[in-house]
């Protein structure tokens, strides 16, 4: 097995304040996301979405958080993609935000439900026109013989809709992740990291620190 040529010697870094476990987890998420928006050069709303088949075979990919509140976290996708098929069969998912520049991550576990048609329509209409056309042209996760086939399909739907409105495809919508666990992780010197997990029981949240 090839080893990476990286040093295991930890260097001292500017320490962040300890995670406040008395805080509301959503207020803490908002503060960390605000820090990420100021510090991260690329897509601070990027998150890893992990799904699994009913028999436990996992898969993961990067998606973009598009909205959130205390009810949960929303992303949009093709409903015929692998992730959507796995969510339909097993709605338990995990999200992971990693902000390297801040040396922080947030891990969220919860269950998915579909967003409403009104929510999906409103977000779809806000997308760039070429992205809306692409949602019609692409059979996401299906085999593609040649790139020219995708370009041909895009040309066809562009001609079909012209300068008129582009409706949302029936196979395109969003998923709402309703969290039952939110873990905050912060890098500290010598791998003695700061971890805290907030867990939902009913409508109440409780928090505890974890060993790093």
Curated annotation (Swiss-Prot):
The keyword Transmembrane helix does not apply. Its cofactor is FMN. Pfam families: PNP_phzG_C (PF10590), PNPOx_N (PF01243). FMN binds at residues 61-66, 76-77, 82-83, 105, 140-141, 185, 195. Pathway: Cofactor metabolism; pyridoxal 5'-phosphate salvage; pyridoxal 5'-phosphate from pyridoxamine 5'-phosphate: step 1/1; Cofactor metabolism; pyridoxal 5'-phosphate salvage; pyridoxal 5'-phosphate from pyridoxine 5'-phosphate: step 1/1. Signal peptide: none annotated. Binds 1 FMN per subunit. The keyword Hydrolase does not apply. Keywords: Flavoprotein, FMN, Oxidoreductase, Pyridoxine biosynthesis. Substrate binds at residues 66, 123, 127, 131, 191-193. Its EC number is 1.4.3.5. GO terms for biological process: pyridoxine biosynthetic process. GO terms for molecular function: FMN binding; pyridoxamine phosphate oxidase activity. Transmembrane segments: none annotated. It catalyses: pyridoxamine 5'-phosphate + O2 + H2O = pyridoxal 5'-phosphate + H2O2 + NH4(+); pyridoxine 5'-phosphate + O2 = pyridoxal 5'-phosphate + H2O2. NCBIfam families: pdxH, PRK05679.1. PANTHER family: PYRIDOXINE-5'-PHOSPHATE OXIDASE, PYRIDOXINE-5-PHOSPHATE OXIDASE. Belongs to the pyridoxamine 5'-phosphate oxidase family. Homodimer. Catalyzes the oxidation of either pyridoxine 5'-phosphate (PNP) or pyridoxamine 5'-phosphate (PMP) into pyridoxal 5'-phosphate (PLP). This is Pyridoxine/pyridoxamine 5'-phosphate oxidase. It comes from Acidiphilium cryptum (strain JF-5). The gene is pdxH.
